[in-house]
Amino acid sequence: MYLTVLESNHKFMIKWFEEYSNLSSNQYSIFLNIINSVQNDLSVFYKMNDILDNGNGEFTFNDEDMFVTFTEINGTYELSSSFGSVTLDYYAFKTIISKIIDIYSETYPLGTVVDLNSFYFKDLLPIEDNDSIRVVIMNRFTPFTDELFFYYTGVIYPVGNNGTNISMVNFSPIAIEKVVHEGYKDEQDTQFVGIEKKRLLIDMGMHSTSILTEEELSKVEESIVVREQ
């Protein structure tokens, strides 16, 4: 019997926490409980990452199901929640958040047409601030370095590789503003995504460019847009 996508994601997440995270069961249960509470809405973890990127500040989330507060304290970071608290350094939180985002982000099938938010392509493409970029997803889990991969690679719609010097655009799930048309998806595709996530995220210890440290960001920026030579 096949596991559902959510069941597979939970299985991968627990395996990573138990075997690779160096967290105690009490510590990683805090993250698992938050994941279970937010379901498919990963914005809480993106907001936590914003605090890491800015180096200071505080993020607070509060609803009827749980509260979460994420704060920088003297060079370390504290996550407080309805399920407990944990204090870790910058790199530990970056690693954990990147795994959560990569494992639980929805993976759209090949041929999906999406509008990308221009905010994530400033100075990389000749577009206005309010414009979106329409692309067709042509590849997923594209290796970049031994540690990093691009979640999606696409071509500009409707021209593709013709009539422009832009051959490919590499992007992450957070850049997707709208799904215009979803490509063909079946059981075989679902199994492929699960196999690739396990291979890259668990077995090989890689992560996508969705969540990056300062050092990693400098390596990635010039490769987001691939131009014809």
What are these regions (language model features)?
Residues 54-55, 88-92, 104-109, 127-134, ...:
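Short linear motifs at secondary-structure transitions and domain/linker junctions
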Residues 117-124, 128, 141:
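Short, charged beta-turn/beta-strand-edge "cap" motif at the junction between a beta-strand
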Residues 60-76, 128-183:
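Basic/aromatic-rich interaction segments and small domains that mediate binding to polyanionic partners
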Residues 3-4, 14, 88, 132-133, ...:
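Hydrophobic transmembrane signal anchors and adjacent membrane-proximal interface regions, especially
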Residues 91, 150-229:
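Intrinsically disordered, low-complexity, charged/polar segments
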Residues 20, 28-34, 81-121:
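Mixed-charge, Lys/Arg-rich low-complexity intrinsically disordered regions
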Residues 1-73, 228-229:
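N-terminal intrinsically disordered, low-complexity, charge/repeat-rich segments that act as generic
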Residues 49-85, 90-101, 115:
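Long, low-complexity, charged/polar intrinsically disordered regions
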